[in-house]
Amino acid sequence: STPTEELNPSWHMYSRGYTLSDVFAENPDWFAMSYKSFCGLLQDHGTGAWYYWCIGLLYLTLFAGIGIATFRQPDNLQGKIRFVICTLLMVGELAASIVNSWLIESMAQGRYLLPCILIAGYLASTVPELFQKKIYRTLLSIAGILSVGYFGLVGIPLFF
């Protein structure tokens, strides 16, 4: 029987002497596919790019709102430091996902980025005045509706 590593060249690349850049040579769409699997399902080939652009823009806008609200608070050095540290943790999540692809398997790893949502939620909870703004609540609701709608219209039918 042929070992799994020989059947799939993207498995355990580090232990077989490949460099980190070889991961992206083996899977040049790694970032795009990881993002797609973060926002939806990797197996979904029918959803238009508009969904991923829209949800990405919403996430970035919501996160920027948290940052702006945090940095507008006077005399809140602790909050600003917390925001920077948490943002670095999110970057660390991405780095860990990349390293995982190198050490284990180079396929898209969007599921490993899900803790970023928890970190963003925590940061949002530190600026409760943000939720008093109708525009922020509306954008958050739209993101939620799109996500739940995707799950119901695409995710569930894909597996049944």
Predicted regions mapped to residue ranges:
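Membrane-interface junctions at the ends of membrane-embedded or membrane-associated helices
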Residues: 70-77, 122-142
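Hydrophobic/aromatic-rich transmembrane helices and adjacent perimembrane loops
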Residues: 106-128
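Membrane-lumen/periplasm interface segments of multi-pass, membrane-embedded glycan/lipid transferases
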Residues: 1-68
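Juxtamembrane "helix-exit" motif on the non-cytosolic side of transmembrane helices
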Residues: 70-74, 94-104, 153-160
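Lipid-exposed faces of alpha-helical membrane segments in multi-pass integral membrane proteins
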Residues: 57-61, 88-96, 116, 142-149, ...
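Alpha-helical transmembrane segments of integral membrane proteins
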Residues: 54, 81-89, 113, 117, ...
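Transmembrane alpha-helix segments characteristic
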Residues: 76-99
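Signature aromatic-anchored transmembrane alpha helix within multi-pass, membrane-resident enzymes
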Residues: 130-160
